[in-house]
């Protein structure tokens, strides 16, 4: 089968501490994950996503739009937070999510290449319940989703040849926020990790 190339938005999601959860309650964890998927899969489809690979506790999803991918990430995290409300802290299922826009190789129903690998590495550095996106993805969503972003600067991701500039999604909408927090100019006195960018819809 000949592989073809295309540009795609890739979302990588993984359950935090899945091995620990399985060790504590295997049957309960499997059932809880199944319930998460039953609730999440229709939402993924609604945002144009196609799950092309599952890894037990993880998902790799292709989207035709970066906006769709990021909006889906926000919905998935909101859904997980709601489902965890009545769950003890040590039993909660939380996603880490990474989103990247990049060139990928398509072989049948599978998708391969650096575009997928970068999304997976971004997921790995996201906080529990958090979302990290690449600069390539950020350029496409700024001003189109109702959240802010924290500039984490260039990050060296495992097995990725070049540093990737990363943005953490500020999951709470920040209506009326200024484009850059801080005083004395857009970057004065700030480290990259403290630069928070508003990404509210343009009027």
Language-model-detected regions and their locations in the chain:
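Protein kinase-like catalytic core scaffold
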Residues: 9-11, 16, 100, 165, ...
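Catalytic NTP-binding/metal-coordinating core of nucleotidyl cyclase/transferase enzymes
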Residues: 1-72, 78-79
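Juxtacatalytic C-terminal regulatory tail of Ser/Thr protein kinases
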Residues: 169-184
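Acidic, proline/glycine-rich low-complexity intrinsically disordered segments
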Residues: 181-203
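Short hydrophobic "helix-edge" motifs at membrane interfaces and signal-peptide entry regions
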Residues: 3-5, 46-47, 125, 148-150, ...
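Catalytic beta-strand-to-alpha-helix segment of the class III nucleotidyl cyclase homology domain
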Residues: 38, 60-171
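A generic fold-level signal
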Residues: 2-5, 10, 54, 90-94, ...
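Short, histidine-centered active-site or binding-site loop motifs used for metal coordination
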Residues: 25, 55, 101-103, 201-203
